Amino acid sequence: DDGLLEVAVDTSAGELIQSWATGATVVKTFNTVSYHIIADPSIAKGLVTIPLASNDAEAKARVAAVVESIGMEPFDAGPLRFSRALEHMSTLHMVPYLQDRWEDAYEFYFVTGTAPLGATGVRLAK
């Protein structure tokens, strides 16, 4: 087995939870970073940006405050349906562990403010 997880449904766990708990508010976060980085962000040797996906702006702001309180930077990744992408990132992150290649494990982080300043900095691919 190469470690790639099969997708059972065409949705995300965040969206499934929201559909099952209709009165609840779901904010998808912390699944793109390992537990040991959450416990001690200084291990990352730089700012750790944590994406948040939710349909509720107020709930997302409350969770963003929690992210900031532990020394990380919240990043608004959009509505809850974007948790699909975040969950796939989590799967990619787990591949070395699922293949029993712990020595090849890695972390990845979002870096904001890196886009070109305008359309002049972008060219079409040929």
Task: For the regions a language model picked out, list residue spans one by one.
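Active-site-lining helix/loop region of Rossmann-like oxidoreductase modules
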Residues: 48-126
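Rossmann-fold NAD(P)-binding glycine/threonine-rich loop
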Residues: 1-42, 59
